């Protein structure tokens, strides 16, 4: 089944999504991280990155917010690049836990591996795997360069957010040392946790995340810079991780209602990948009870459903002028 969608249609639907959702008052900012609690709750932006490099944007698409857990996708890509798909599967895994993103119980139940790079335990383990082992500065450079390659522009560390995260990350400290207990962390636990905390504190925009999603959708080639960031054979591995764990214990509901693999973060960002078609991102700080942006979810669902797109419907989608 073939489906053609015009760029003007996408522009119209993105604008409609913004207008439909911007007045929504549901949710509240993350309050357990002081920096996030004080972000303007009315900020809202959407960006779609087409595979020709064109971005369609509306609202606060260029506001820099904390990438938070969306960074897990980026570092998963980095270790897939450095180690290959099979080694990542062996050292971390790719299973959904069915539990909240910061679950300690999940480690106790599945102590032979941290489950997936897209939950906190697996993400901390992923940071520990980044090469060169033992060199925090070079590992950090690799993490930032990888995000830069994916987004097409450099993220900026939000120092105030980093300090807030570091002062309140008690649960993640427990996770790091529990992983050490089970030999599932591959570098110094404190260093690995700090790298994870820093990467979550990087400032990005909805437009940047849409380009990163577009890079995944485009078989590893950044649509804007045209750089081959990773091998195309990794795309289904990355997309399957996002589909099964992107919304943690609610990933099934998300896929059922939206039809697009997407990753969420408590900074208010959501990044969705529709392979072979486009990348999409939306940002708004107020979160639902599971830590997912209320407006971003509604906006992306609106776009997907209005355009009649779904990763599972088997349609070959062509975007025309």
UniProtKB/Swiss-Prot annotation:
<dbReference type="Pfam" id="PF04960">
    <property type="entry name" value="Glutaminase"/>
</dbReference>
<dbReference type="InterPro" id="IPR015868">
    <property type="entry name" value="Glutaminase"/>
</dbReference>
<feature type="binding site">
    <location>
        <position position="266"/>
    </location>
    <ligand>
        <name>substrate</name>
    </ligand>
</feature>
<feature type="binding site">
    <location>
        <position position="248"/>
    </location>
    <ligand>
        <name>substrate</name>
    </ligand>
</feature>
<dbReference type="GO" id="GO:0006543">
    <property type="term" value="P:glutamine catabolic process"/>
</dbReference>
<feature type="binding site">
    <location>
        <position position="120"/>
    </location>
    <ligand>
        <name>substrate</name>
    </ligand>
</feature>
<feature type="binding site">
    <location>
        <position position="196"/>
    </location>
    <ligand>
        <name>substrate</name>
    </ligand>
</feature>
<comment type="subunit">
    <text>Homotetramer.</text>
</comment>
<comment type="similarity">
    <text>Belongs to the glutaminase family.</text>
</comment>
<feature type="binding site">
    <location>
        <position position="172"/>
    </location>
    <ligand>
        <name>substrate</name>
    </ligand>
</feature>
<dbReference type="InterPro" id="IPR012338">
    <property type="entry name" value="Beta-lactam/transpept-like"/>
</dbReference>
<keyword id="KW-0378">Hydrolase</keyword>
<dbReference type="GO" id="GO:0006537">
    <property type="term" value="P:glutamate biosynthetic process"/>
</dbReference>
<protein>
    <recommendedName>
        <fullName>Glutaminase</fullName>
        <ecNumber>3.5.1.2</ecNumber>
    </recommendedName>
</protein>
<feature type="binding site">
    <location>
        <position position="69"/>
    </location>
    <ligand>
        <name>substrate</name>
    </ligand>
</feature>
<feature type="binding site">
    <location>
        <position position="165"/>
    </location>
    <ligand>
        <name>substrate</name>
    </ligand>
</feature>
<dbReference type="GO" id="GO:0004359">
    <property type="term" value="F:glutaminase activity"/>
</dbReference>
């Amino acid at each position: 089944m073939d489906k053609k969608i015009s760029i003007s249609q996408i522009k119209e639907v993105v604008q409609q999504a913004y207008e439909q959702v911007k007045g929504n008052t549901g949710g509240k900012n993350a309050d357990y991280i002081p920096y996030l609690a004080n972000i303007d709750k009315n900020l809202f932006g959407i960006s779609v990155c087409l595979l020709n490099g064109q971005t369609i944007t509306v609202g606060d698409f260029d506001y820099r917010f904390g990438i938070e857990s969306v960074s897990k996708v980026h570092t998963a890509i980095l270790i897939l690049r450095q180690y290959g798909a099979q080694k990542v599967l062996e050292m971390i895994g790719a299973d959904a836990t069915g539990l909240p993103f910061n679950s300690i119980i999940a480690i106790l139940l599945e102590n032979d591996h941290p489950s997936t790079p897209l939950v906190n335990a697996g993400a901390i383990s992923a940071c520990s795997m980044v090469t060169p082992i033992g060199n925090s500065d070079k590992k950090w450079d690799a993490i930032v360069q990888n995000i830069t390659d994916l987004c097409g522009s450099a993220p900026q560390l939000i120092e105030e957010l980093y300090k807030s995260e570091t002062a309140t990350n008690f649960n993640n400290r427990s996770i790091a040392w529990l992983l050490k207990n089970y030999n599932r962390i591959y570098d110094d636990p404190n260093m690995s946790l700090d790298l994870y905390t820093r990467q979550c504190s990087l400032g990005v925009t909805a437009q940047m995340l849409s380009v990163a999603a577009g890079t995944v959708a485009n078989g590893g080639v950044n649509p804007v810079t045209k750089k081959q960031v990773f091998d195309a054979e990794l795309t289904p591995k990355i997309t399957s991780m996002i589909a099964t764990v992107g919304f943690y214990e609610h990933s099934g509901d998300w896929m059922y209602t939206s039809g697009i693999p997407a990753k969420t973060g408590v900074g208010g960002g959501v990044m969705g990948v529709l392979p072979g078609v486009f990348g999409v991102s939306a940002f708004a700080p107020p979160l639902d009870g599971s830590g997912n942006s209320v407006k971003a979810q509604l906006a992306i669902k609106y776009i997907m459903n209005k355009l009649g797109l779904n990763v599972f419907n088997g349609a070959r989608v062509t975007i025309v002028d």
